[in-house]
């Protein structure tokens, strides 16, 4: 059976939430919580690798017994776009298949991880988590998903999802070939509102911490 390596990317710089990866979060940190969550999956994973340009974060990973990858500072900077970052990450980490696992999604359950891995094993196609949205959306002065002359109730809007990036499971070869963690063949696993939370702002951090504490008390 081909191997699955969970990859946890973290970097020094955080433009909106300073030191968010190691900042105190529910008595721990986002990095530590993610590592422990992945370790709890046991034999479902073959390896866990933390990729970072930060010595302190790499030290945390080593203390928790997982592998590390020293990321080039250029690929940890805002100078590279997502595609460049994804391709470099896949080229730098060994393993048949990679499970992209950012620390900014701390509320993903063990059941969801298992569901994603099971789907990947059974169907053999990339897997990515998504969140369904039902909003009247506009771009460049025009509605995107409805007609202004016949505005539907929100529940009747077309099914549109956005990538949460909470779990993205893909073969290493596909990740390099597509320079991405998703492809046109990806199977989408829908998350609920709680699990789809992604920390990008100070408010996100506070809300996620409150919900994490509520869920784990």
Name what the model sees in each region.
Residues 55-99, 107-115:
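Short phosphate-binding loop-to-helix
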């Amino acid at each position: 059976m081909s191997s699955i390596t969970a990859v946890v990317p973290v970097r020094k710089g955080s433009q909106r939430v300073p030191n968010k990866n190691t900042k105190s979060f529910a008595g721990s940190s986002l990095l530590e919580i993610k590592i422990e969550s992945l370790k709890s999956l046991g034999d479902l994973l073959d390896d866990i690798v933390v990729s970072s340009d930060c010595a302190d974060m790499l030290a945390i990973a080593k203390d928790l017994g997982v592998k590390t990858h020293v990321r080039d500072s250029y690929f940890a900077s805002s100078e590279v776009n997502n595609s460049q970052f994804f391709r470099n990450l896949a080229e730098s980490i060994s393993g048949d298949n990679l499970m992209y696992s950012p620390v900014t999604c701390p509320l993903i359950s063990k059941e969801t991880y298992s569901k994603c891995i099971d789907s990947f094993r059974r169907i053999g196609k990339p897997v990515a988590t998504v969140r369904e949205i039902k909003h009247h959306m506009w771009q460049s002065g025009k509605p995107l998903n409805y007609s202004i002359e016949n505005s539907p109730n929100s529940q009747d809007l077309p099914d549109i999802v956005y990538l949460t990036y909470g779990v993205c499971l893909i073969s290493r070869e596909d990740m390099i070939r597509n320079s991405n963690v998703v492809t046109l063949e990806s199977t989408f696993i829908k998350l609920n509102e709680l699990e789809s939370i992604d920390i990008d702002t100070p408010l996100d951090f506070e809300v996620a911490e409150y919900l994490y504490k509520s869920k784990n008390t």
